Amino acid sequence: MLIQAVGVNLPPSYVCLEGPLGGERPRAQGDEMLMQRLLPAVREALDEAAVKPEEIDLIVGLALSPDHLIENRDIMAPKIGHPLQKVLGANRAHVFDLTDSSLARALYVVDTLASDQGYRNVLVVRGESSQGLEVDSESGFALADGALALLCRPTGKAAFRRGALGGDPAQEWLPLSIPLNTDIRQVGDVKGHLNLPAQPGLPEAVRAGFTRLAGDFPQLNWVREEWFGQGRPDGRCLGPFELASQLRAAQRDRLDELLLISFDPFGMVVEGVTLELAGEAHA
């Protein structure tokens, strides 16, 4: 998979949560809709690559938060691909959404599918608007809100690898769950609850898993998500949106290929995919 261009848009407000899995994360406020973040991020990527919406062959959306995502607060679903297609005007694009998938796994699946279909311009978007979810106050875990857009060109050459978290192999990590509110009576009701138990050493285990997985590709530089503030100089963690600045830095450094590593909090594993990069001159 060739990354042609990157776009990102984050809320200006940050919320800091205490706890072993806490940190300072961008947080959507009030009546903000995810489309307010998605559309600028996508347009940034399209402008950078000089690609028009009608030239997009496939749109793939990834989101975890079951909240009001588009222009209407009554909409509640993690699917973002079709609403984005409509607003963007990408009328000839095929569309599907992936849920409970890491970005690394999604890019690998999309590369395989899209190359088989002969698609040329593929838009992969990752977005969160989680103000309708109760955060885990005990562990301090929350989702980072915002939008990431990757304009890709399938190559059919992506390699994928999954690995365990680092630390004690006998440790059984409890995964993230998002129990939904089954008694929603009005728009402002809580949609669900983020539940990732406070587990000592989890941030270190995730980062150790990243390092170990990267060791399987010693010839490649790697970029990674950052889900936890513990161990960070400023306590700030942008989740998958952390990748935007790293991918741009790799483009500036004229790297031709790298490894992107994601954390899957539902499977409690780390996953990596190899990517090719279009340089700044190409992008």
Curated annotation (Swiss-Prot):
Main location (coarse class): cytoplasm
Transferase listed as a keyword: no
Gene Ontology biological-process annotations: secondary metabolite biosynthetic process
Subcellular location: Cytoplasm
GO molecular function: acyltransferase activity
Coiled coil: none
Gene Ontology CC, one term: cytoplasm
Record's keyword terms, sorted: Cytoplasm
Means of activity regulation: Activity of the complex is inhibited by 2-aminoacetophenone (2-AA).
Domain of life: Bacteria
Subunit composition and interactions: Forms a tight complex with PqsC.
Sequence similarity: Belongs to the thiolase-like superfamily. FabH family.
Function: Required for the biosynthesis of the quorum-sensing signaling molecules 2-heptyl-4(1H)-quinolone (HHQ) and 2-heptyl-3-hydroxy-4(1H)-quinolone (Pseudomonas quinolone signal or PQS), which are important for biofilm formation and virulence. The PqsC/PqsB complex catalyzes the condensation of 2-aminobenzoylacetate (2-ABA) and octanoyl-CoA to form HHQ. PqsB, together with PqsC, catalyzes the coupling of 2-ABA with the octanoate group, leading to decarboxylation and dehydration, and resulting in closure of the quinoline ring.
Protein name: 2-heptyl-4(1H)-quinolone synthase subunit PqsB
